[in-house]
Amino acid sequence: METDTLVDAKTGRKCYLDLPSGLAPGEEVTFVLNLHGGGSVGHWQREYFPAYDYVDKYRLVVATPSAATKEPTRHWAADADDDYLVDLVESVLDRLGRSRVRAFWLAGHSQGGMTSQRLLAGTDYFADRADGWLSLSGGRLGPAERSPDFGPPRTEEERTAFEEATARRDVFQRAPTPTADFSFIFRAGEHEITSLPDTSPWAERYGAGPRIRQADVVDDQPGKIHDARYDANPTLSWGRKPTPGTAQVYVYPNGRDGRVIADVVRLDKGHTEGLEPCVTEELIKLMVSAPGGKVRALSSASAQAG
């Protein structure tokens, strides 16, 4: 694996870029834009969803940036970040060469997942290029209801003040359902949601069959990171210190055009417990099994038009 730091020429903003070692000329890669959640940064997200551990094995290129806005908590905002994210993706595509990008995925934790949905629903650039969306507790197409006590430990006054501040800035507003075509994988911790729906409107859209439970993914090693601010008073929904774990995997088979639609639930886990090695790899396997080609098709069409 090779790790580089991308520096945006306009803003000076930095981004982690993880690439596979020994890329051969013309070798295909899967490109992942990995977005952190509210109150987080790129460094934390890179450890929470450590796709970099698998860039060599699955020939991934993973870009993990940080949002610009810091108040009331660091978060992605359209006016502060969308142009930057487009420029970031363009810089990576220029570096790689568009013809070698087999697939392009958005991955986002929490508000980063909500931002992924907003980009897919409201930004032609991403709708036209993204082949898939991995929502890491960032919302489900066909919602999974949040647990009633979801969130970090706060007094009622603290919770109310935070909700009012975020509402004023539209930080956690859910975007419309995208109309673009893409594969969709939802992953959540058991304690974050009341229950996982047993149907999926996204699967129905692609004519996929009823969900099939796959073999559980069992990890004997913990994740790399968690929200240590609340170690003295953790909640199940927000998450505790990382531990080994088991995840249930559900796949909706035979979606049109090979689209991958899947749900993954980590048992006895909350919102901020970093992903364990095996469940991380399982998510990546699902991603690379999905069809791609949008970036390549746009590049080809542009070349023909030119």
What is the role of each PLM region?
Residues 190-194, 271-273:
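Acidic catalytic loop of the alpha/beta-hydrolase fold
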Residues 23-74, 142-143, 272-273:
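Short substrate-entry loop that stabilizes the transition state in hydrolases
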Residues 185-188:
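Short beta-strand/loop motif that positions the catalytic acidic residue
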Residues 275-281:
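Post-His helix in hydrolase/transferase enzymes
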Residues 75-97:
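Alpha/beta-hydrolase active-site loop
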Residues 1-31, 61, 77-80, 100-125, ...:
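A domain-start/cap signature at the N-terminus of enzymes
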Residues 264-269:
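Short glycine-rich catalytic loops that host catalytic nucleophiles or stabilize transition states
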